[in-house]
Amino acid sequence: MNIHRSTPITIARYGRSRNKTQDFEELSSIRSAEPSQSFSPNLGSPSPPETPNLSHCVSCIGKYLLLEPLEGDHVFRAVHLHSGEELVCKVFDISCYQESLAPCFCLSAHSNINQITEIILGETKAYVFFERSYGDMHSFVRTCKKLREEEAARLFYQIASAVAHCHDGGLVLRDLKLRKFIFKDEERTRVKLESLEDAYILRGDDDSLSDKHGCPAYVSPEILNTNGSYSGKAADVWSLGVMLYTMLVGRYPFHDIEPSSLFSKIRRGQFNIPETLSPKAKCLIRSILRREPSERLTSQEILDHPWFSTDFSVSNSGYGAKEVSDQLVPDVNMEETLDPFFN
């Protein structure tokens, strides 16, 4: 990971394009028309706004073009000037970027966790670059209705592997959900954890937390039941169980349009597993979604479960068929933060 300084340059343009070839042709013509223009970090002209209005301009920072926003005003599509590689750029206030990215800095690299490729420091902003993605797991499950066991096992193993690596490295993720996992390839066979910005860095072996952090559909019973502390890792594992159930069944194990009713169902910890799932899949779900935190599998134990070594070409003949059913995974409902419900 490279960290260096550069000054952003605003390039005036009319309209915007999602076509990177057009972006490069436009930049090329600008550079040809102004041969004396330098794009070096030592440019002496005053800095433009750090996050410009991208409907009217493109910003050049270091060796990258920042194009249209992907999320709010802090996540942008970016293109490498020379290779044409497409990336994602997150923009942070320079005063707090180190704190926001601290979990990334303290964790070793893992194939299923999004890695920072480069950080460029402007005068007031930090520009953090990541590899591009190809959609998220939540949208994928909504589109597919639900996943066959073989596909779910392959993807969920990668998800659990990322979480286990974080736990082993002293991080509790706190806000685990399908939307946090994104695809690394167009074929949607490889996933990675999108960010660690909500993660909590543990001080030693004690993983006790007291904050009520996360999304209603994924929150564990003990977070709802106590005003004291709870095991952060066990709460993460509960969220993994919600994710696995949703991938295989096509709906959340606990769902209700009223938050109070939803929380009552989660506190009881009772849910139904369709008979269409294989015995090993049912076993894994029940071993994770246990009401008592100490009875749940750990993230590392999940990876050792026999479901992942199943010969699905044989076992799937009677289980996991994609029969038509109601698809109840909402677009954004119950994906909000818990904060409004406890303030």
Swiss-Prot record:
It comes from the Eukaryota. Residues 25-50 are annotated as: Disordered. GO terms for cellular component: cytoplasm; cytoskeleton; nucleus. Its main location: cytoplasm. Expressed in granulosa cells of the dominant follicles of the ovary and down-regulated in ovulatory follicles. Pfam families: Pkinase (PF00069). Keywords: Cytoplasm, Cytoskeleton, Protein kinase inhibitor. PROSITE patterns: PROTEIN_KINASE_DOM. Residues 29-45 have a biased composition (Polar residues). It is found in: Cytoplasm; Cytoplasm, Cytoskeleton. One of its GO terms (molecular function) is mitogen-activated protein kinase kinase binding. GO terms for biological process: negative regulation of fat cell differentiation; negative regulation of interleukin-10 production; positive regulation of proteasomal ubiquitin-dependent protein catabolic process; regulation of MAP kinase activity. Residues 61-308 form the Protein kinase domain. The protein kinase domain is predicted to be catalytically inactive. Interacts with MAPK kinases and regulates activation of MAP kinases. Does not display kinase activity. Belongs to the protein kinase superfamily. CAMK Ser/Thr protein kinase family. Tribbles subfamily. This is Tribbles homolog 2. It comes from Bos taurus. The lineage of its organism: Eukaryota, Metazoa, Chordata, Craniata, Vertebrata.
